Amino acid sequence: MRTLLILVVAATLLPTTVSAQSDTSWLDRPLAAWSQASGTVPPARAGTESQSALERRCGSSSLTASAAAHAVRNAGWVPFLHFDRVIARDDVEVLGGMTAATSPGCEPTMFNLFVFVGGRFAGTISPIVMGQGRDGVAGAVRVTAADALTAEFARYTTKDAECCPSSRVRVTYRIERAQPTLVPIDLRTLR
């Protein structure tokens, strides 16, 4: 019975792990818009523990009142501040949502970053769920203007240690404000 339980858990988690490692090719192809002007935060895939257990363990009481945190939470994610910092300018806010985290420490291991404009969801900075120490994980995110932001992503090869990606790229996004939508417009290698 115990072996069966282990196999079921492994089979459930394996597709998510493989997907998170192999879908980062979006950084290697010409940029294409993945966010749509639906205003709906994409639903979270199940993590390694329930949303309520992860919320109790890693949730932030300072994120309970914002409209963005409410929308992220309602979609099954646990809201968090990326690098423990508020990322906001004018009415643009970037908020993290996780479905798994390290224990102890609560470092997100399955997450995405959600962009809100005037409290309305505009899109995610990555078309896939990201994981720490994996190719395509987000680093610094900056709101550079009322209609623009940038995000840096680590690029790992199979020979890189988790601490040390081979390179970094920066994606620049335009925010279409009428029906808030996040659109990637440029990708540049930084190193």
Locations of the language-model features?
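Positively charged n-region of N-terminal signal peptides that target proteins for export
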Residues: 1-4
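Exposed acidic/polar residues on beta-strands and adjacent loops within beta-sheet cores, strongest
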Residues: 20-191
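Bacterial N-terminal signal peptides
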Residues: 6-15
